[in-house]
Every structure is written in C-alpha cells, then in structure tokens.
Amino acid sequence: MMEILRGSPALSAFRINKLLARFQAANLQVHNIYAEYVHFADLNAPLNDSEQAQLTRLLQYGPALSSHTPAGKLLLVTPRPGTISPWSSKATDIAHNCGLQQVDRLERGVAYYIEASTLTAEQWRQVAAELHDRMMETVFSSLTDAEKLFIHHQPAPVSSVDLLGEGRQALIDANLRLGLALAEDEIDYLQEAFTKLGRNPNDIELYMFAQANSEHCRHKIFNADWIIDGKPQPKSLFKMIKNTFETTPDYVLSAYKDNAAVMEGSAVGRYFADHNTGRYDFHQEPAHILMKVETHNHPTAISPWPGAATGSGGEIRDEGATGRGAKPKAGLVGFSVSNLRIPGFEQPWEEDFGKPERIVTALDIMTEGPLGGAAFNNEFGRPALTGYFRTYEEKVNSHNGEELRGYHKPIMLAGGIGNIRADHVQKGEIVVGAKLIVLGGPAMNIGLGGGAASSMASGQSDADLDFASVQRDNPEMERRCQEVIDRCWQLGDANPILFIHDVGAGGLSNAMPELVSDGGRGGKFELRDILSDEPGMSPLEIWCNESQERYVLAVAADQLPLFDELCKRERAPYAVIGDATEEQHLSLHDNHFDNQPIDLPLDVLLGKTPKMTRDVQTLKAKGDALNRADITIADAVKRVLHLPTVAEKTFLVTIGDRTVTGMVARDQMVGPWQVPVADCAVTTASLDSYYGEAMSIGERAPVALLDFAASARLAVGEALTNIAATQIGDIKRIKLSANWMAAAGHPGEDAGLYDAVKAVGEELCPQLGLTIPVGKDSMSMKTRWQEGNEQREMTSPLSLVISAFARVEDVRHTLTPQLSTEDNALLLIDLGKGHNALGATALAQVYRQLGDKPADVRDVAQLKGFYDAMQALVAARKLLAWHDRSDGGLLVTLAEMAFAGHCGVQVDIAALGDDHLAALFNEELGGVIQVRAEDRDAVEALLAQYGLADCVHYLGQALAGDRFVITANDQTVFSESRTTLRVWWAETTWQMQRLRDNPQCADQEHEAKANDTDPGLNVKLSFDINEDIAAPYIATGARPKVAVLREQGVNSHVEMAAAFHRAGFDAIDVHMSDLLGGRIGLGNFHALVACGGFSYGDVLGAGEGWAKSILFNHRVRDEFETFFHRPQTLALGVCNGCQMMSNLRELIPGSELWPRFVRNHSDRFEARFSLVEVTQSPSLLLQGMVGSQMPIAVSHGEGRVEVRDDAHLAALESKGLVALRYVDNFGKVTETYPANPNGSPNGITAVTTENGRVTIMMPHPERVFRTVANSWHPENWGEDSPWMRIFRNARKQLG
C-alpha cells in the first residue's frame, strides 16, 4: 500500500524566479509556480498512530518555508519507474534505523503547480521538459500515479540467440538490437566459438563478451598493430608507453596490472583505530602512493551531473580496489567542452554550430557536471585539489582541411592519489573455494551498456541505448564500502581481502570474470544471490547493469565471519554470490528458473580475440599565419581574460571540499585573498609529518590541430613546470598518468595519435627520466548530427591530458604565485628560447584563428635543467613566488601573480624582442620566479649552472599598489589597474555563478573582488599560540577518553581524533551501529565529539536523519540524555555533528535557544577559508580565546542559522550563547557573501549551552589544527595553528 505525505516547499524564491524567466524566454506564458516535496511510503503493513506520527516527523526537515494550498495544474516529477533514487535508498535506511520496519521504501517527488495562460499540449510538454531530467526522472499528472514507482514485476527469463538455426545473421541482428558494438571479426570469432561448443549463445553471454571486449575495456587501438603510410610500425601504442617504465622503473612498485599504479612513498605515522579496542594511534610505516586518472566522457555528455559524479566515484573505487585494498586521499577533476555561450555574456569568438538532440550543451555540462563531480568527492570525503577547464569549438583549417573541431563530446577527467601499505601492493592468491563477494549497493536496471556505448561516436548509437548507459550516484554508499576496505587493510597480515576489483563498465559481467581470471581461477555463481532492488530484471540486466558503488572481492571461507562483522558495523551491504574454482570456467546458475544463463570457458570470453590492425595515412596541417591586422594589446588582454580556459575558476573550486582529511597542504586558493591560481596540489603524507604527495596537470590540446607531437610534448612539459613548485628532488620521483582522447578513424588522427604517443613514450619521457605507469584512452571523440538538411560532425582535437604525481620531501616549501612587495625582482625563465610562437594559443582562439607554428619543447636538456634548478632553489628557500606560463602567455602569468599578491607589477619586455604581442601572449614553456633583490645575482648564477643562462630575463618587480604596467625600453606597451584586470578575469565565474546559484550572492562576491582596499585574511589573537595549556595534564599520564562519534556517511572523524589525540586524549572510534547494537555505551567516556560529513547523504535534512535515529530509539536516546546530564562531561559537534546536535535540543540541558542549521543562502555547498571571531560565551572549549580573529575551514551546504523569529534571535544573543561569528577582512561581523558563506544572521556560526559544556559549530577546527593544513597562514606560526587551543582547552577542563 502507498501512503502520500506532503513535504516542505522545494524551491527558494530565486529558484522560482529563474524558472519563470526560463519559461518567459521560451514564450511560455507561465504566471506562477509553487513547488513542494511529496513523499511516498510503500508500506508492507499499516502503521499505528505512534508510528504514523514518527514517520510524519521524520519527513519534516529543511528550512521553515511557508507551505500553502497549491493552485494550478499539477506536474509531478519523480524518479523514473523501475529505478530507485539515491534519496530513496538513504531515506529508507533512516526509517529502518528508527524502527519503522513496515516501510519497504520511501521515495520523493516534487509537485509543481503551474498557473499559466492557455497552453497547447506541445507547450505543456515544453514546460514539463524544463522541470525534469529525462535521463533520470519522469512526469506524472496526479499524485496517485506515483504508485507506478512501487510496481514489482516478475523476474524475466534469459533469452537465447538462434545461431545454430539462423547462422551469422542471428549474431548481426543481436549486435544491433542489444547495442553490442561488435566488429565483424568479433562476430566471426563468436560464431566459431559457440559452434564449437555446439549450442546457441544466451543474450547475457553475448552482452558480457561485448562489454569485456569493448574498446573501453580492452583498449584495442592501443594494443593494435600499426601500418602508417604503407610501413609496418615496430611497436604498438601501449608498448611505447611501457617503454617509459622499461627505461625508468625507479620508485615504481606496480604498473599496468592493477586498478591504479603504485610508487614509493614516505615512512610516516598512519593514523587509525585498533580493530579490537577502537583506540586511535599512529602506526609508523611506509605510506606508498597510488595514482589513477579516468575519464567519463559519454555519460557526462548525456546527463552531466550523474555522468561526472559516477566518473569521480568510479575512479575513487579504482584507488580503493588497488592491491589488497587501499585508501583514496585527494582528487583532481578536469573538463574540456565546446563554447559556453553564456546568455547575455556571449563572446565574439563563440559561434553556434548546432549539436545533436541527445546530448546537452556545453553550458549545461559546465553548470551541472562540476557540481556532480564535486558532490561525489564532498560526500565521499575526498578533497578535490586541482584540475583544468578548457573550452574549444571552431571551424578551422587543420590536417583534414576546413572542419568543425571542438568538444561536443566532452572530456570529463577524474583522478587522484591514495595510500597503500607495502604488504598490500600486490594482489593475493585466490584459493580454490574462496568466497566471491559483491560489496556495495543492490543491482538496479541502470547504466546498461556503458562500456560499449562509450566506445562509439556520439550519435552512432540509438538514443534509448544512450539513455540506458547513464548511471546514478550514491557516494554515501561508496563511503560505507570504503570504511570496510579501510578496516580490512588496517588489519595488516590479517586482512581478509585476497583480491579486489571495482565494478565499472559492464557491471558484474566484466568485474567477476576479471577477478577470477586475474587470480588464475574460474568461478561458479548463483544469479539470485546478487542483491537486487528490482525483481523484474532479466538475468542479463542483473549481471550486466552498471549500478555504482560496488566492488568484487575474494575472501577465504574461514575469514568470512570477520568480513561479515566489519560490513555489519559499517552497514555496508554485501552478498556472497559464488565460489572460486580450480577450472578456469565461468558458470552462472539461476535458482528462480533453475537454468544456466552462462556456461563458458573463460578463454572464450577473455581469450585471444582478433587483434586489430590500423592501416592509416599521415596528414600534415598547413595552418595560416595569424592575421594580426585588427588585434590591439588592450583588446587582446580583455578577450583573453574572458576566455574560460584562462578566466578565474572560482565557480569550479568553491563547490568542492578542499580541507577534509586535515592533510591538505596546498589547495587551489592562494594567499590572504584566496585567488584560485595554485600550480599544483600538495597533501601531507600523514597527520604527523611534513612529507607529502603532489599532483599537477598538463594539457595543450588545441596545439594538436597544428602538430600532434608538439601538443603531447607540451602536456608533459606543462605538468612538469606546474609540479616543480614543490620540493620533490630527483625527477625520477615524478610519475605520470597519460589520458589520451582521440577521434579514431577520422582522417589523419590515427597517424597523429601514433606520432604523439611516440613523441612522449619513446623520446621525451625517457630523455627526462619520467615514467608513465598508468593512463587511459577514449577513442571515440566525435559527435554526428543532422542540422536541417546538412550532416554535421564535431571532432575533438587529439587531447592528451598528463597528470603528474610525486612524493614531496617537505610540503612547507611549496611555492605559490602570490607576489611579495618586499624589495624583489621578477625573472622570466623562457624555455621557448625566444621562439614566441602564437599558433593554437588563447590569443589565436579569441580572434577565431588557428595560426601556423605552435609552441613546443625546444630543448629537452634545458627542460630537465629547469626542473633541477627549481628543485635546488625551492630546497634553498631562495624563491618568493613561482607561476608557470601557459594558456594566455606571460601576460596572464604576471596578472595572476598580481591578483594573488594584491599588488602592482612594473615590468619591461624589451629583452623579449620587438614583437610585443608575441612576447606577451605566446604559450611556450617556462614561467616567472620572484626573488629577493639581494638574491637575484645568486639565483641567476645558479640557473646558469643548470644550462639556463640564455633563457633567463630580468623583467622588473612587484610593487605595492594597483598599477599593472608593461613597458619596452620605458615606452608603455600596456597599462591598466590591477583591479580592472581582476574584474575582467572574474566575469566568467561571476556569470556562471549567477546562472547556477543565488544571483544575489554571486553579485556580492563579484563586488568584493573590485574592492582594492580589502586587506585580505588576517589574524588577531588574544592568546599565545605557542603555549600548550594541556602540557601539565598530559604529563600526569592520564588520557581521558573521547568518543569520536560517526554515523554512516560521516567523513571527518580521523582528523578529529588526531586533534584530540594531540591534546592528550585517548580517542575511541564509535559508530552509531555500536550504540544501537549495544556493543558500546557512552558511560565510559568523559567527552563526546560528533564529526562532520554527510550522514545518510544529508537526506531528510543535514544531520536530521542522524538525530532522529537517536531520538526515536529509546535505549540510545537514554544513553545520550544521561551523558548530557552527567556533570564533568564535554561535547563538541562540528558541521554535520553540529547539525545533528542542534536537533537533540530536547536532550541537552541549556540548549533550548539553539537554532537550526538549514540550506545556505547561496543554495550551494560552500567550501571556503573564512575569518571568524571568538565571542564572549560560556563555552569551555573556547576559554581564553575571546576576541581572537582567525581563518578556519568551512565546508557545508546547510550551515545557515535559522531562528523562529526576531525574539528567538534576541534571546540567543542576550543569553550570550553565540560562540563564533563570521567577520569580514576588516574585522566586522558580517552577513555579506562570501565572508559569511551561508548568510547566517549576525554572522552566527557556533553556539554553546548555558553551562558551556556542549558547543556546536559549523566550521572545522579539526581540519586546520596543524598550521600546514591552512590554505594561508602567517609565516611565524609553528606546528600548531591557533585552533589547537580548542582541544587543549578540552583537556584542561577535564583536569
């Protein structure tokens, strides 16, 4: 039976206004919209009155917006029938944890009530199209239609293909019907294989074969034989990549054979809890570094949010499934798309060439895609710390004559680093009889055919198949699975995981054969043991769907009880679906129909399928010299600063958590003005050391339109000039991931790909001592469509994205582009050696040209000399700032350095030649260093020692003030105020934020950037930062116990435990399942801390589901109430823990006036480094800190203080319960965005109880208790930041 429960309004006023504006723009006469959430409960039994009241209260959440009786035509938007939304999965979990077992499933829709003039049926269809994502949602016309969400179908049987009766044609028909993308020789192979077996193939077997052997999974082009211009080539593409490892195997522990590559890391203290006692401690051991970079281009073109989200999620699983289990740590994200054409902000180089109906626009991709990628990383608990963003779409004269080149099929890049134990780097042995397990969520009828679909050019496959290949994301589920993997690897030798793979393209049909085959075994499986939420699925759909957040594992039978215990504690679902067999054979039984959908020798599935041969021709690009007749430097500056590739990326950065883990030493945001210009990302290797890891990206795809090999060399060079900003040492410590995107089969591209791979794999990397142990290829970068009577194609440039990874010697020595105004000198290191080529530059692009000659690596020895010189200078602390030269050239390099330093620049470019335009806008490799004036001679001498004497040019200096002046022999070439340039550079991000977020907030942030008097972040302390007030208590040897409390989805518990540990506590890991199961009670603890993250993925309100699972469970409720009423206890709630505790007011004495914390005013997740002031309050944790102003990490989507009315706010203030407030850089309490990131009244961001024993706050002191983890800090801070005082206060209070 289905019950319908009304919810709160679903859209804020500005969202409704945006919708109305969209309708008006489309000539749809809609006058008013009201939207509210509607909940649908699928019940297996009636609820009694108290259960009904409980369910009603459970579904009351979010901001208190006024509901009213709706008027107008109803359009009900729900998830597509036959799918289960992530919201549903998590809300149902909460209901069950609150004891409501009669609820089989909760689902949520949005009821839109539309008041409009008379609209035609077609116009109503247009209105409905604006309100839902057709890939994931459907529109009903009545609330009762939602019953279709809960229809349970009978299981469908397997179907076979009559190969023996109909011959080869049966396979050809199945190939088209199922979208298998099989080549002719593969059809021949299958015909021969099944004829030999003497039986017809089942659809599931063909589908499994197609996925396992798709270009996406098998990389046929990279393993192919090559004939170019009639000459057979000696090596495959993959062999040339492997040449880099053969030449430089140094420091590589695993390459080419696992889900990620592994290199040597540093010996540090890895911090985690003991399995038996729950006590956190440091474990001194090597933390080896794993690295992986994936792409998820096809799904992102179809449905950007889930496409980008599952792209990030799949890459995170690759990291976790490395060796015998590993720990993902920090991520990177990248996007290449066609022109944005922002409405009202269209640029002169942006022409609309049309697009296929089934893919979305570049603007849609960059509005939704980055949010999806960021949301997954945020909710999983992985900081995203670097990335790139390129737009390109133009009609150009390239290798193949005049044609359209651009990114209608986008690049969505997702990558990152993690850590792994030395003894877990290699997979174990799968013993015969080992249990074969699927860890993670249930099978759902989604993502079917992703591997085969992404192997086709967009437009080749059927729209319904595109539709079927889109996946959905549930990062909180993946977090639970990762917690299980963490518990396993933390057991060391007792790790129950023998072998692990992630489930990606092709679902279990790819993952399980890969698992047993890689382990030298076969597998015997039972289909109906696979967890499934949709009983009507066919065997093919159960086995081959791409439901996300799943892993496949082999666990020895005697270790199963331990594995079961770990999964139950973390609430991570799993199923034993088979056993490993001696014989390398795959069998899948179906208990329901008592038949065998799969019965195949593994070598038929994964054996010697036909090898591809590429017989291709070379085409040379002629290019036309740049026409400079209408180009002035002043106009060029403004255009280039508006090009999204160059322009400010704040809209892509602040949506992503950059502080979770407490181990982020360098994020994108630089300096007191938090300008997103960092060259590389840096993390600490642990919470107790200064060793670390670095990541950078290099990418120069448009150059491939003129010179394939130069483009590839530049990508490597740029990654190197970016990562050189930190202290790495030997260049052989740097390892690269190469991600290759090409339109294979397009004239000239295949030979160009071969040239590019050869340039990097056979020449440049071996010469530099660089290794490429990991990478990926995407070979179908083309879209086709019909535009009127014309057939059109948009082909991407050959695109190599290089990600560089390295171990860092000392993270404190990392340079940024932030200029200093002390007596200084700016030096250009020009690795282009005066070539100053303008082909395929940002300058050329903004004038709709390509040019002829591009930049290139001019001298490999000098590039190596540059890196070595930088390392010597970084280690000697001789440099004040560094920024590489890339998109936009020297002018942009200097401008971004000035923005970061909030200062002026005075440089003279006479030494760079007479062609000032080329000097300022060429994109040759190199960069600008800033040195103290007194060190200039010594630095230049050192650079000369490394063979760079002819590359170094003194430019001028950074000065206090606002002028940005470029001269040549004292004649002004360009002069402008830095603030004006800063505003131009920011306009793209402003416009994107206005479109996507609350426009009022976007306007306030843009306005703040125009304020030249802004002093930036600053610190005012009322206490001695170096005093350890906990030292006398630590000296007693007593270590009070703090319960580090987490719920499923919480992700900030480890750094919280470390902060309390440093202050003299024994930090104990306590999961809510421990309390609910009665395994642990709070009676033994002196302190309790509820940690940050996304409990239940913030479903049913941030922290509210967690709170209600306490309030609605009598025993646990009593446990918390007793703790809060006990004298001599302390409690802290941070972020999600703050939101949760604010909902426990009825249990906490003196908290009656506490507010609720609801959706940010910007309507967006905000990750900021914000200035706060400690106010006078009873809080015991903030004693002695009153009046201090200091920056702190902020990462939340629901942090805005909500009070009932003005009287409530006045009472909260008059009782003195406000503990922290946001202040602006002038030290004034503020409600202005982004200084106040959530719009809380009076800047309130922390409150306490009347006795001061319980304090809750939205910002994260635990993420910045180490100075090195602060995005910016004064030079004189030592190991501990001022926020360490909170934890030491806690230790002092407990005596």
From Swiss-Prot:
Residues at which ATP binds: 307-318, 386-388, 678, 886
Alphabetized Gene3D superfamilies for the sequence: 3.40.50.880, Phosphoribosylformylglycinamidine synthase, linker domain, PurM-like C-terminal domain, PurM-like, N-terminal domain
Consequence the record notes for mutating T683W: This mutant shows a disturbance in the secondary structure of the protein and causes a 30% loss in FGAM synthase activity
Residue span of region Disordered: 305-327
Highest taxon above the source species: Bacteria
Keyword Disulfide bond part of the UniProt annotation: no
GO cellular component entries: cytoplasm
Protein's cellular compartments: Cytoplasm
EC number annotated for this UniProt entry: 6.3.5.3
Group of enzyme by EC: ligase
Phenotype upon changing L1181Y: This mutant is extremely deleterious to the structural integrity of the protein
Record: active site: C1135 (nucleophile), H1260, E1262
Binding-site list for Mg(2+): D679, E718, N722, D884
Pathway: Purine metabolism; IMP biosynthesis via de novo pathway; 5-amino-1-(5-phospho-D-ribosyl)imidazole from N(2)-formyl-N(1)-(5-phospho-D-ribosyl)glycinamide: step 1/2
Sequence ranges assigned to domain Glutamine amidotransferase type-1 in this UniProt record: 1042-1295
CDD domains in the cross-refs: GATase1_FGAR_AT, PurL, PurL_repeat1
Statement: the UniProt record of this protein carries the keyword Signal: no
Keywords carried by this UniProt record: ATP-binding, Cytoplasm, Glutamine amidotransferase, Ligase, Magnesium, Metal-binding, Nucleotide-binding, Purine biosynthesis
Catalytic activity: N(2)-formyl-N(1)-(5-phospho-beta-D-ribosyl)glycinamide + L-glutamine + ATP + H2O = 2-formamido-N(1)-(5-O-phospho-beta-D-ribosyl)acetamidine + L-glutamate + ADP + phosphate + H(+)
Any GO molecular function: metal ion binding
GO BP annotations listed: 'de novo' IMP biosynthetic process; purine nucleotide biosynthetic process
Family, per entry: In the N-terminal section; belongs to the FGAMS family.
Subunit structure of this chain's protein: Monomer.
Job description of the protein: Phosphoribosylformylglycinamidine synthase involved in the purines biosynthetic pathway. Catalyzes the ATP-dependent conversion of formylglycinamide ribonucleotide (FGAR) and glutamine to yield formylglycinamidine ribonucleotide (FGAM) and glutamate.
UniProt cross-references to PANTHER family, sorted A to Z: PHOSPHORIBOSYLFORMYLGLYCINAMIDINE SYNTHASE
Protein name: Phosphoribosylformylglycinamidine synthase
Protein species of origin: Salmonella typhimurium (strain LT2 / SGSC1412 / ATCC 700720)
